[in-house]
């Protein structure tokens, strides 16, 4: 089915039959925040980078107690080795569970990507840390099963200079190009974009928001 870049055409699309019948999928939060792997009850461990900015938070107290003085979130790159990660093992487990699709967090609000991105130089799992393309590895492994590969992608990044300066400029120069890169490179069956960031200038030409 071909859709035009107007709202009437985009709104005419229907949920794919496979997704309506899928019933069960698996959402995978795994990234740099998995190194400290900490949060207080009722909070999100993947928000660790943000939480330790608050001097009074439980995460900050944990951080100061466990890690050397001056340790920054960015320093966790050296500890993100993923030496036990086996994409085929994951894929087989997902299929055995009965899941019909998965969504891997390709990038969370910390901006760290689990794929090589031209828009996240030196802040992705290929350039630094484990030096592996986890999106690519998992997609390839899942193609040997009946489980469909999908991705989650954070719309905004807490401390990206462009986002802090001008969210619309960030969307046009960083977010949308990275999304196009991700979709073109991996052709995911599902794309889950998280958090509201809407730029009226480019939206009609580039994206559909639902």
Predicted regions, residues:
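An active-site-proximal structural segment forming one wall of the substrate-binding cleft
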Residues: 93, 141, 168-186
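Active-site groove signature of glycoside hydrolases
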Residues: 103-112, 153-161, 176-197
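Conserved small/polar residues in nucleotide/adenosyl-binding loops
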Residues: 198-203
């Amino acid at each position: 089915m071909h859709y035009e870049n107007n709202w009437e055409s985009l709104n005419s699309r229907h949920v794919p039959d496979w997704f309506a019948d899928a019933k069960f999928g698996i959402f995978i939060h795994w990234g740099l925040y998995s190194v400290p792997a900490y949060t207080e009850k009722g909070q999100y461990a993947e928000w660790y980078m943000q939480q330790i900015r608050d001097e009074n938070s439980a995460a900050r107290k944990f951080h100061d107690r466990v890690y050397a003085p001056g340790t920054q979130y960015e320093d966790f790159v050296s500890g993100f080795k993923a030496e036990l990660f086996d994409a085929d093992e994951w894929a087989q487990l997902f299929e055995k569970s009965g899941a019909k699709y998965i969504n891997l967090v390709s990038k969370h609000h910390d901006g760290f990507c689990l794929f090589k991105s031209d828009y996240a130089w030196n802040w992705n799992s290929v350039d630094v840390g484990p030096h592996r393309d986890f999106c690519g590895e998992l997609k390839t492994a899942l193609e040997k099963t009946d489980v469909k590969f999908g991705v989650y992608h954070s719309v905004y990044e807490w401390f990206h200079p462009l986002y802090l300066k001008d969210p619309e400029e960030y969307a046009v120069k960083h977010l949308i190009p990275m999304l196009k890169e991700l979709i073109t490179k991996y052709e995911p069956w599902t794309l889950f974009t998280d958090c509201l960031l809407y730029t009226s200038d480019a939206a009609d030409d580039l994206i559909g928001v639902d």
